[in-house]
Amino acid sequence: MEERLSVFGCLACMQPNPMLQTLSSIATLALGVAMVFGAPVPDGSWPESKGSVSYEEVYTIKAGEVFDGKMKTYDRTNITCHGQEESGNSTAVFLLEPGATLKNAIIGKNQMEGVHCDESDCTIENVWWEDVCEDALSIKGGTASSVSKVIGGGARYADDKIIQHNGLGTVVIDGFFAQDFGKLYRSCGNCKSNPRQRFLNVSNLLLDLKIIQAQRVDPNVSIVMMNENFGDQAVLHNIHVKPSTENYTECASSMGTNISGSRPVILSNGPKNPVCQYSYDDVIIVLDNEQTQAQKQH
């Protein structure tokens, strides 16, 4: 969680990083490869649970393993949500090793950290978070060529972030439904391991911004937030938005820092190359079952 402190003491974060420039071509290639997915846009419905499973400790999905949850609800026996309190993977439901896949599962409310992919290169397919706690999915570690994928599924009631990306490489989010949330994706803005360059491709999303029960840490929604000074790049395509009365932006850029607990300064909202790559033709506003192209910043 990013607290509200000044970032201007981090002079090193404002300087160009030669390593990031070197890794940029590798990660850009990974981003291009990741863009081949094409999931359908969600219809806004939530799946019915086929049963329940509670774990006493985090369940590890090994490298190369595919865990099919068969649409049951998974949570923890001894963990309850404590809002935006950070705790680590010991309070998650699932921990995925590189190359692991979690699919067809519902993550219940009795947990704190949802799903962890602590070395990147994992696949999350048709996974649903019924009530997000601190984060739904945390992606860490990896290399510049790492690609982690979130295909289908959905999440709701996130006070802040749904997907937190602290590691390296690319994240792909395709065909995802998010409801009542603060941010769908955040490239970590205050990790001690920064500066790290991160890449994002999001497409075929349905985003319902109406406040239902989330206690948002920021009243204004940023669907994705990237760190411009670290060379982050996001590509957005076919984004369907059901707006609420609060302000929102599809993509915000910030000045990232490596000061834990600081709050990065927002630099811009809306399309801006290369950090926020999209046009308003890529955004479809859904009002009373009618769809219109977005024409201006919100």
Predicted regions and their residues:
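LRR N-terminal entry segment and analogous cap-like coil->beta motifs
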Residues: E65-F67, M71-K72, T77-I79, G88-A92, ...
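Poly-acidic low-complexity segments
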Residues: E2, L20-T22, E113, E134-D135, ...
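Non-catalytic surface loops within mature trypsin-like serine protease
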Residues: L31-V33, P98, G141
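Extracellular beta-rich repeat passengers
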Residues: V41-Y55, Y59, V66, M71-E86, ...
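Fungal secretory targeting signals
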Residues: M1-P40
